[in-house]
């Protein structure tokens, strides 16, 4: 593969990174640690802080730890050392991706008066992930959704609103038996005990269906121990969902109702900017083993947005993909765009840790080990995400 990287000698070259969550953040750190002096990274991210999504289910139930899951981007460019200032983080909404002209349009969230602006790029890392289910999506299902600015304080308020809704409801129906639904159901049941009726429904007979049946067996046993009612093996009949979403039927005729319904259904890839021709039938970006977009070798797609050869959507797979993509970009830059063999991404076996209440968890490792473990602290060790990024935890409100 040969890519023309020729530009005027006085023109700085740019790698645009769309999204700075798990995948984007790792790609940024690998890039800035090794880029030549005439290259910069420009990051477009709508949140002012990294959202530690894996702890969101817990924080939407348990009070007092919300501030820990919004982590400053302060050290994002730290590996660049003395050249840190040449890289840029823009708090912005991405509007349009022009692949032919190699430019992306955006609007600054804190300065909408400046209008739509364009950024030209030489390589682009697409790490916009997926549209999240409402129970963990701070950009939806919120009273202040129209004024949400992606700030930490808005995110904290969103989680507290979620806590209030759960506390007020006497009966709760959770739709979806993946990790999110399971974690919410067990956390609510442990926190509130028999004072709340909790029902978990899932379209398949097996909970956590992408994993070993042992994971389902342990999960189902724990849910029954906690008094959570299970309604498995039938989908929600969407035509029967009431306007307030408090009542609906399953396709097998069973009727469910609650004061609060939490729809924890699957994520959908956030890939509309890439264009329909670049997507598979599930809306995921079609990529080469090098993680280059099949339709454009200058664009690398990583994380939940990529159809990455069977890889599950998870932080550890996003990390691995980010490393492959960033290393390939660096190799192309170092080789002046000339034809070369690039690194290929190979997905690892499915692995996950799922909490089953405040103090219990189960884990399936990449080696296929199935173990019951301590779930860790009540905040799911969220402050570790701070220290791993070289941040002090003395002030968790920064």
From Swiss-Prot:
Keyword Transport part of the UniProt annotation: no
Gene3D superfamilies assigned: 3.50.50.100
GO MF entry, a single one: electron-transferring-flavoprotein dehydrogenase activity
Single GO cellular component term: cytoplasm
Secretion signal span: none
Expression triggers: Expression regulated by iron through the urbs1 transcription factor.
InterPro entries, A to Z: FAD/NAD-bd_sf, FAD/NAD-binding_dom
Pfam families the UniProt entry points to: Pyr_redox_2
Keywords: Virulence
Job description of the protein: Protein of unknown function; part of the gene cluster that mediates the biosynthesis of siderophore ferrichrome A which is contributing to organismal virulence.
Record protein name field: Fe-regulated protein 8
Organism in which the protein naturally occurs: Mycosarcoma maydis (Corn smut fungus)
């Amino acid at each position: 593969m040969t890519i023309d990287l020729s530009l005027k000698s006085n023109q700085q070259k740019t790698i645009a990174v769309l999204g700075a969550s798990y995948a984007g953040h790792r790609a940024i750190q690998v890039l800035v640690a090794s880029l030549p002096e005439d290259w910069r990274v420009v990051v477009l991210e709508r949140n002012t802080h990294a959202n530690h999504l894996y702890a969101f289910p817990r924080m939407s139930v348990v009070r007092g730890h919300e501030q820990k899951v919004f982590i400053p981007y302060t050290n994002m460019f730290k590996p660049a050392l003395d050249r840190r200032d040449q890289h840029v983080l823009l708090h912005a909404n991405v509007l349009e991706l022009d692949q032919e002209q190699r430019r992306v349009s955006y609007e600054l969230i804190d300065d909408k008066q400046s209008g739509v602006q364009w950024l030209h790029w030489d390589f682009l890392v697409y790490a916009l992930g997926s549209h999240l289910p409402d129970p963990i999506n701070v950009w939806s299902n919120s009273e202040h959704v129209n004024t949400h600015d992606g700030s930490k304080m808005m995110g904290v308020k969103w989680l507290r609103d979620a806590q209030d809704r759960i506390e007020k409801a006497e009966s709760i129906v959770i739709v979806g038996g993946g990790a999110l639904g399971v974690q919410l159901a067990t956390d609510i049941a442990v926190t509130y005990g028999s004072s709340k009726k909790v029902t978990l429904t899932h379209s398949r007979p097996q909970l956590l269906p992408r994993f070993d049946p042992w994971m389902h067996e342990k999960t189902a046993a724990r849910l029954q121990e906690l008094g959570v009612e299970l309604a498995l093996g039938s989908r929600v009949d969407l035509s029967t969902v009431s306007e307030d979403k408090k009542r609906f039927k399953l396709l097998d005729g069973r009727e469910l109702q609650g004061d609060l319904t939490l729809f924890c259904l699957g994520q959908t890839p956030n890939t509309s900017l890439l264009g329909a021709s670049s997507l598979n039938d599930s809306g995921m970006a079609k990529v080469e083993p090098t993680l280059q977009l099949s339709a454009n070798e200058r664009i690398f797609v990583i994380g939940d947005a990529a159809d990455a050869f069977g890889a599950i959507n998870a932080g550890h797979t996003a990390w691995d993909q980010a490393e492959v993509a960033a290393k390939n970009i660096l190799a192309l830059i170092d080789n002046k765009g000339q034809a070369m063999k690039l690194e290929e991404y190979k997905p690892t076996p499915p692995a996950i840790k799922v909490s089953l209440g405040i103090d219990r968890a189960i884990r399936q490792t990449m080696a296929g080990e199935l173990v019951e473990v301590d779930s860790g602290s009540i905040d799911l060790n969220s402050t570790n995400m701070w220290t791993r990024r070289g941040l002090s935890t003395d002030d968790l409100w920064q």
